[in-house]
Amino acid sequence: MNEKERLLRALKGEETDRPPVICPGGMMNAAVTELLGEINANHNTDLDAMVAAAIKVREVIGFENYGVPFCMTCESEPFGVIISEGDKINEPRILEYNQSKLEDIMKSSDPKISNNLRSETVIKAIGRLKNDDIPVIGNITGPISTATSIVDPIKLFKMIRKEPDEAHIFIEYINNYLIEYAKEMVRAGADIIAISDPTATGEILGKKNFDKFAMPMYTEFLKSMREINTPVIIHICGDAKTIIDSLNSLEVQALSFDSIVNMRFAKSKLNTRLMGNVSTLLLQNGPKDKIISITKNAIGSGVDIVSPACGLGMSTPLGNLRVMTDYVKGSI
C-alpha cells in the first residue's frame, strides 16, 4: 500500500495497514528552519524552492505527503493587503490590512489566480509535485481566517455583531473565491484539499455566529469539492466542544483538531474521520519519549490520520518530528 492509497483509503473510512502520518502544509507547515538550510531561494515565493521544500518535508522528516503552500497569506494577497513574504526563520504574515469598506474591496478586487503571482506559483508547484504514489495536498486558508487577513479582525467581528448582513456577504464573496482557488489546485494535480480556519473557533465566534457565518461556507465549499470528487480535511483551532455538534453535520472526509481537544470525546461525537493531534508545543520542545507517548495515545484515542495538532514553530527540531513519523511507521 503506497502513501497515496493509504491516505485516500483512510479518508474514505476504509481499512489501512496503519494510520497515515502527514503534515498538510499551509498553517501546518513542516518547512522549518533546520530543513531549509540548503534551499537558497525563498520557498514561499520561488517555484523551484517551493517544490524542493515540499519534497524535503517528506524525505527528511518522513511525512507521507507533499503539501503547499507553507503559509496562510496567499489567499489575501489579491485584496490590497501588505504582506511580508517570510524567510527561513519567519513565516509570511500580514503587515497591513486593507482599510477600505468591505463593499469597496469587493468592487475593486480582481482575485483571479492569474493576477496573483504567489497563488499561481502554488498551482505550478502542485503540477510539478503531482505523482502516482505520494498524495499532494493543496492548502486553503478558510473563509473566516482569510476575511480577517484582509480586514482588521476587530473590524470584521464588530460587523458580525452590528452589521451581520454586510459581513456575511463579504465572507461569502471570499468563500466563492477560495472555492475557485481550490478547483485550480485540483486541476493542477492536488489529490486532497486541506482547509485551516484558525479564526473560526467556538471561542472566538461563539456557537451562534459559527453556525451562521462559518458553517454555510464550509457546506458550500464541500459541495463544490464533492462535485469534482476531491476529499477535504478541515482543521479547527481551539476548544471545539461548543461547535462539535455543528461540525458533525458536515459531509467532510476528516476533521483535524488542536491538542486541547480530547480525541476520544471527539470520536464519540463525530461520524467522520479524525486527524491530529500531537501537540506542536511538545514537538517543539520534546522530550522525544513524551512525543512517542502522545503519538501512541493519539492513535489509541481513535485518530485515523496522525499529524501535528496545529501550526509548527519554525525552530521545531527535525529530530523531534522524525520521532513522531518513525513511531507511526513502526520504526521505533
Spans of features found by a protein language model:
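Active-site loop segments of alpha/beta catalytic cores
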Residues: 1-31, 36-39, 53, 89-94, ...
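Segments that shape or occlude catalytic/ligand-binding pockets
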Residues: 32-71
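A contiguous, low-structure linker/loop signature
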Residues: 71-112, 131-135
